[in-house]
Amino acid sequence: MNLRKASSLLTFMGFLWGAWGQSIATPLPSATESKLRTPVVGDADSVYHKHETLVNVQFSQVQLSQWAAGGQSSASLIAKVDQFWEYDGMDFGWDTEFHGAFGLLHRPDDQVILKTDDRIELATKLGRRLKDKGSLTALGSFRTQLAPGYATVNGMPDVNQVTSRLMAPGYLVLALGLDMKPTESTTIFVAPFTSKSTFVLDDSLSAQGLFGVLPGERARHEVGGYIRVGLKEQVTENVTYAARLDLFSNYLEEPEAIDIFTDHVLTLKVNSWLSTTLGLTLIYDKDVELVLREPDPDIPGDPGDVGPGVQLKQILAVGLSLKFS
């Protein structure tokens, strides 16, 4: 490990341990602790339960006939389910959340169906409350997709070039750290002890050594530090902003190349069943190789550029929005 890598590792570890030590040494002001994290006074057997389910269905259609300006007819559908379970007792807290999304775009003119969204994610946190100092927490997080993804050639999916599928990749994070809630709308989880596993359970994809696994291997395991920051803010009566930031640094290999996952959702509620949603997701993982530049057909033997890069997804949709609790 060269000096630059060692310096980056020490800086990241120092930040983790500094956040850990500061949170243990400095109690959270009682005025800023959330009602959820405040121990129930009186009955030692008192507990707090909360369950919430959000269902969103968004649809759009473009129909063109003899349209002089040109264009293509299309129809798209995106369905999302978000579920949250919260349990709080005097000494323990347990939070679980599930996020599922799937979207398709149909172009009838060329009989093409494209996938526009695909996400399966489950995360759970079990914490032992430390008096006035947050919670000592174990976290487990899993993320994958449902349907195969294909390479796109000239705007068309090539079904002979599968680039991803269920559990290829799949990501599992297991972490032990301190969970803090400095304000009513903010959570911070700092874990100096974290295991991150990447699974590629498709033989054809693992043989290519995709997503950081060695060619022919089906899994890759990393040890490092992990930080998760969450925010859910009621901006106005009808506008909600939710954000999440995950950071992971591999202690043993290129610790300065931090994996980033961040998700932002702005929801504008029109009425009890209609809403507009603006979503932005950004991912950076040095182990995921992307086509940064297509080969130039005018240059013989040009391989193009392949390497790590920023993955970006943006969604603007209007549709049905239902909430159950």
What are these regions (language model features)?
Residues 1-46, 325:
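Cleavable N-terminal export/targeting peptides
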Residues 51-55, 94-98, 136-140, 172, ...:
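Transmembrane beta-strands of outer-membrane beta-barrel proteins
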Residues 57-63, 89-91, 100-106, 142-148, ...:
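Transmembrane beta-strands of outer-membrane beta-barrel pores
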Residues 64-69, 108-112, 149-156, 200-207, ...:
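Outer-membrane beta-barrel translocator domains and adjoining extracellular loop/strand segments
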Residues 65-71, 106-112, 157-164, 212-217, ...:
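Extracellular loop and loop/strand-boundary signature of outer-membrane beta-barrel proteins
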Residues 73-79, 116-120, 168-172, 219-225, ...:
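Residues that define the transmembrane beta-barrel architecture of outer-membrane proteins
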Residues 86-90, 127-133, 183-185, 232-238, ...:
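Outer-membrane beta-barrel channels and translocator barrels
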Residues 266, 310-325:
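Outer-membrane beta-barrel "beta-signal"
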